[in-house]
Amino acid sequence: MKTVIFLALLGLAAAEFIEIGYKVCKSDGTVSQVKADGCELTVKDGKKVCLFKKGSRPIIQIAFKPSKDTDKLKTSVRAKVGGSAMVDFPQTNSDACTYGVKCPVSAGENQIFEQSISITENHPAGEVIQVNWQLTRPDSGKEVCIIFLAEIKE
């Protein structure tokens, strides 16, 4: 088990994060930076778009300051594909405290959330999608809500 954890940490240490374009949606906390590893940044129609390769596991990193003390935060990811309704992106674990957030969370304390996502062969390629990433408190308050554009390539 220790070997698996060490290899996972080694993989994160070798990551090459780049700043991506994002917008903050309604949230209580303050987002200071959003980065990604495994993202090829391009510009389409004047907007920054992260290109993710099928079969890859890009990592998203969000630096933020929470507005309230809380015991835990939950992560959720949704995507808007082809102008349709938002679709939940499946996750095996939604506990943000397992992705670098120091819990219990203290208001005003800098935090870094870091989670990898799996881009499977089933994801549609060649279309720009809107990704909505949130970290919510048990009272349903949003500490983090960001939107960024992504495209999956073969």
From Swiss-Prot:
Protein's GO biological process: intracellular cholesterol transport; sterol transport
GO molecular-function terms, A-Z: sterol binding
Record-annotated disulphide pairs: 39-50, 97-103
InterPro entries: Ig_E-set (IPR014756), ML_dom (IPR003172), ML_Npc2-like (IPR033916), NPC2-like (IPR039670)
Compartments in which it is found: Secreted
Signal sequence residues: 1-15
SUPFAM superfamilies: E set domains
Main subcellular localisation: secreted
UniProt keyword annotations, A-Z: Disulfide bond, Secreted, Signal
Top-level taxon in the UniProt lineage: Eukaryota
A single GO cellular-component term on record: extracellular region
SMART domains: ML (SM00737)
Family to which the UniProt record says this protein belongs: Belongs to the NPC2 family.
Protein name per UniProt: Putative protein heh-1
Name of encoding gene: heh-1
